[in-house]
Amino acid sequence: MGRPIIGITGELEAARWRTWIREAVVSPVSYTRAVERAGGAPVILPPVPSDSVPSLIAKIDALVVAGGRDIDPSLYNEAPHGQTDAPDHRRDRFEILMIRAAIDADLPFLAICRGMHILNVARGGTLIQHLPDRLGSESHKPDPVKMTTHDVQVSEASKLGRVLGAAAQVPAAHHQAIDRIGSGLLSVAWTPDQVVEAVELQGHKFGIGVQWHPEEGDDARIFEALVAAAKTAPAAPPAAEVTGSRSKRSSKRHAARS
């Protein structure tokens, strides 16, 4: 069997290479390396118009919704906090559509940091825009340019618990977190100060969001679990069928991966 195709959401940023300064699709290489080490074939997905989403979902075997800047607070009916990043509306719209389409298609997905926030907001949840206001400290992002490492407690009854066990040390850097949890999501990991560190979509083959950055650490188990789920997922339906309710995926695609 060939490597399953793992789509990784990217963003558009001004970038310089050789003599050029152009808008480019940007993604930290740690994401692609993590997917490769786990046995997948990574593909970076730029923010594209909504009518391209069904075609993308039909061609990938799993989705990684990557980290990045804060999402637009108006998407969960709040005004922006003074510490909230200026939003990237194009990426926000694209990733919400992608995560909803992945859910409809029962496509395995892993949502990381900002990606977990996208998942929560796509399911009607809300965010804490600036954790220090709630916690009284910057313990979850003590350095603006470096990851910190902290402990998380994991529900052993969850899919994530079956991958990681009851506890883990994880690399993280965030000033926002889940507040009200979205419909169908279940919190499955927490820090000692009770910040939600992971959620799972109930009834989904593999639908996990984590607040930390597994692509930055040495523990490959989450990516290995995602790739394993992608290998066993039914083949993708035709693009026109993706936006409906969960549908049967064609055997032709499955044969192409054999």
Residues covered by each model-derived region:
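Active-site-proximal beta-strand elements of phosphoester/diester hydrolases
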Residues: 207-212
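Conserved G/P- and acidic residue-centered "switch" motifs that form tight phosphate/ATP-binding loops
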Residues: 113
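N-terminal beta1-alpha1 cap of cysteine-dependent amidohydrolase-like domains
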Residues: 1-110, 120-121, 128, 132-163, ...
